[in-house]
């Protein structure tokens, strides 16, 4: 009775207050009326080494082109084997020569020979740029850095030192001293940084204090404070890893994107075997976004990263085809030569899951992880289409299913939202695969298509592997503004409502180093020192942190809002998005909900608002509480807002 009286009062109240709000809405939620179970792997992240996401980004290596393998077959003017290095940095006299004879190993064929004629000659690595405007490496006082370098000498007399210093030679760390021997040897040490306040970026500087010839290869500098320092690749940047973890990702899709495929020439295929084993033996390759991949963040490290951030691994392998979006490229692997590649794919699964008595399982154990990784899915192909793709997909996925029947293979549905022709092939031939959809659309497309999955047959599971709301570019870059994030939020209400058919989804791309980006928008921006979280990031985080176990009945009347209601055993989540610029008075009518307090997490602001390095908290979620009484919660949603109410059910 009390509830009925409240409702009558409420309706009267809404009537009298109508002039104050452009919108009013009543959302009736029946927590006891379950519609379907929700996918427990719905939200994840998609990592690709685009925008220097890996090298110069998540990968903890601070030196750029540490092993002189940098080259770009497509654009030789852009990079060369000396990229990132400066020679004749200080005094002394010497010559340098790029060498290939008797290298460190066959996979790491280039090194630099220093022929020093006057002691004091210096060479320096400038890192990836301490900021968007200056070169150098950002090092911090009081921090320790792990360093190593491979050296060899036949006739050198004297020592080689390594230290951090500025461009003028002011020391920023202690000095490590090595006496190179006749064989390639790895020399290691710790550098403790002491950087005066407000000074410039540092360089890692080698000083040749003797004369003669020294060969140098594979130098490395990583902050001791990183995650994964025992991984053979060396580990990942702590702040970025923590930002990923805070998204509560259920899975990690890697290593691309187009990167997983490679472009133009078959030697550019992403070969997972090149990315495992001792780090100095990994065979580098340039990536499709124009720079070199050191592979220090390789497949082993990706699997470890998954464990670190609490995500399940979702590797993508190419389907014997280079990135089809790029034209004028080498032909795919012929069908009658596919066997060797199929074996590579099976070897990858063995690497992840095989016993330590198998060849690849043994390598995994040797690298530090005897236990298998929890590999459940394998995507074969990225953005592919046509018979040329499906024929190869069929062969590879059949082989996988035969050897590992519990692994779900994922088939690509091409690069566009209008993918019905791909779906008709898939439904007729590969209905038991999961289907990877990709689409980047104007922001307004997303709310307009919130019902996209309502009509999808429930027989085949969808993986929305890449999506993002695109705004018009400003100065060449599409902004990560609040409006785009809210359009994604509106769309996610539709995804959640259809999470019986959409099993997984992830925003793309994930990371971008400021000033070194090739693609916008991106979920997380960073520079040498800081991490910038976008409004789009916060939406992903808010939705992922409040993943229900089932979708419950909800019905909206009144103003146009986007909404979904889900629940766990003891909590009801109501997600509401207001895409209009006007506030809306919202009434939640809730059954089976005790009196108490709901917590509210809300992202709102100016539609064009963005976060920037100068003002990183312009758009951040705020937490508040709202009373729930007699099954009613009333609130005023601001214009341009996404709100998530977490309402205790007991
Ligand atoms: O996410 C950026 C790129 O977009 C991916 O590499 C590719 O799959 C898509 O075209």
Model-derived regions: residue spans:
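Acidic, Ser/Thr/Pro-rich beta/coil linker or hinge segments at domain junctions
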Residues: 594-633, 637
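Active-site groove signature of glycoside hydrolases
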Residues: 255-258, 319-320, 324, 354-388, ...
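Carbohydrate-binding surface patches
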Residues: 560-595, 600-605, 640-646
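An active-site-proximal structural segment forming one wall of the substrate-binding cleft
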Residues: 191-196, 201-203, 232-249, 295-309, ...
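Extracellular and organelle-lumenal recognition/adhesion modules and their flexible linkers in secreted
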Residues: 23-294, 312, 327-339, 382, ...
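Bacterial N-terminal signal peptides
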Residues: 8-16
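Catalytic-core region of carbohydrate-active enzymes that cleave or remodel glycosidic bonds
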Residues: 398-401, 405-408, 426-427, 434-546, ...
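Conserved, mostly hydrophobic/aromatic
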Residues: 45, 149, 248, 306, ...
């Amino acid at each position: 009775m009390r509830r009925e009286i409240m409702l009558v009062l409420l309706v009267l109240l809404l009537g009298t207050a109508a002039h104050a709000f452009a919108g009013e809405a009543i959302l009736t939620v029946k927590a006891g009326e379950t519609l379907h179970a929700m996918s427990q792997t719905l939200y994840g992240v998609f990592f690709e080494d685009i925008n220097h996401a890996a090298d110069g980004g998540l990968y903890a290596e601070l030196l750029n082109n540490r092993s002189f393998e940098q080259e770009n077959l497509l654009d030789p003017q852009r990079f060369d084997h000396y990229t990132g290095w400066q020679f004749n940095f200080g005094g002394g006299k010497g010559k340098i020569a790029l060498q290939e004879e008797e290298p460190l190993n066959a996979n790491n064929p280039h090194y630099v020979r220093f022929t020093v004629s006057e002691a004091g000659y210096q060479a320096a690595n400038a890192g990836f740029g301490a900021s968007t405007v200056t070169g150098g490496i950002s090092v911090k006082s009081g921090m320790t850095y792990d360093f190593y370098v491979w050296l060899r000498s036949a006739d050198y007399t004297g020592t080689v030192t390594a230290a951090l210093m500025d461009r003028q030679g002011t020391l920023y760390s202690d000095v490590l001293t090595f006496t190179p021997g006749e064989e390639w040897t790895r020399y290691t040490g710790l550098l403790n940084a002491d950087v005066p306040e407000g000074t410039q970026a540092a360089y890692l500087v080698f000083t040749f204090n003797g004369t003669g010839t020294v060969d140098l290869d594979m130098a490395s500098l990583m902050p001791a404070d990183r995650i994964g320092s025992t991984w053979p690749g060396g580990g990942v940047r702590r702040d970025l890893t923590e930002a990923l973890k805070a998204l509560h990702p259920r899975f990690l899709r890697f290593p691309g994107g187009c990167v997983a495929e490679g472009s133009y020439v078959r030697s550019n295929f992403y070969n997972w075997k090149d990315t495992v084993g001792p780090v100095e033996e990994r065979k580098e390759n340039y990536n499709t976004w124009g720079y070199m991949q050191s592979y220090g963040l390789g497949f082993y490290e990706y699997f470890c990263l998954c464990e670190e951030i609490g995500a399940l691994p979702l590797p993508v392998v190419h389907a014997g085809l280079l990135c089809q979006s790029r034209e004028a490229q080498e032909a795919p692997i012929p069908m009658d030569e596919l066997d060797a590649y199929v074996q590579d794919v099976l070897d990858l699964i063995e690497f992840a899951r095989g016993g330590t008595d198998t060849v690849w399982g043994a390598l995994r154990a040797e690298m530090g992880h005897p236990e298998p990784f929890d590999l459940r899915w394998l995507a074969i192909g990225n953005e592919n289409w046509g018979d040329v793709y499906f024929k190869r997909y069929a062969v590879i996925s059949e082989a996988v299913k035969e050897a590992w029947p519990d692994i779900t293979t994922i088939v690509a549905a091409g690069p566009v939202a209008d993918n019905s022709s791909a779906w008709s092939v898939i439904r007729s031939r590969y209905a038991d695969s999961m289907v990877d959809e990709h689409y980047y659309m104007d922001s307004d497309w997303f709310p307009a298509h919130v019902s996209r999955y309502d009509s999808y047959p429930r027989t085949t599971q969808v993986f929305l592997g890449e999506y993002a709301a695109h705004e018009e570019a400003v100065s060449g870059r599409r902004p990560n503004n609040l409006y785009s994030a809210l359009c994604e939020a509106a769309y996610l209400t539709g995804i959640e409502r259809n999470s019986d058919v959409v099993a997984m989804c992830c925003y793309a791309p994930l990371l971008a180093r400021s000033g070194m980006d090739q693609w916008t928008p991106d979920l997380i921006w960073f520079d040498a020192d800081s991490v910038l979280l976008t409004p789009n990031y916060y939406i992903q985080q808010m939705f992922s942190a409040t993943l229900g176990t089932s979708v419950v009945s909800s019905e909206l009347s009144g103003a146009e809002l986007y909404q979904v209601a889900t629940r766990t055993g003891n909590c009801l989540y109501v997600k509401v998005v207001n895409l209009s610029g006007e506030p809306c008075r919202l009434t939640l009518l809730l059954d089976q909900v005790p009196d108490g307090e709901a917590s509210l997490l809300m992202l709102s602001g100016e539609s064009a608002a963005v976060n920037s390095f100068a003002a990183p908290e312009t758009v951040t979620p705020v937490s508040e509480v709202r009373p729930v009484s007699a099954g009613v919660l009333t609130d005023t949603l601001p214009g341009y807002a996404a709100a998530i109410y977490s309402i205790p059910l007991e």
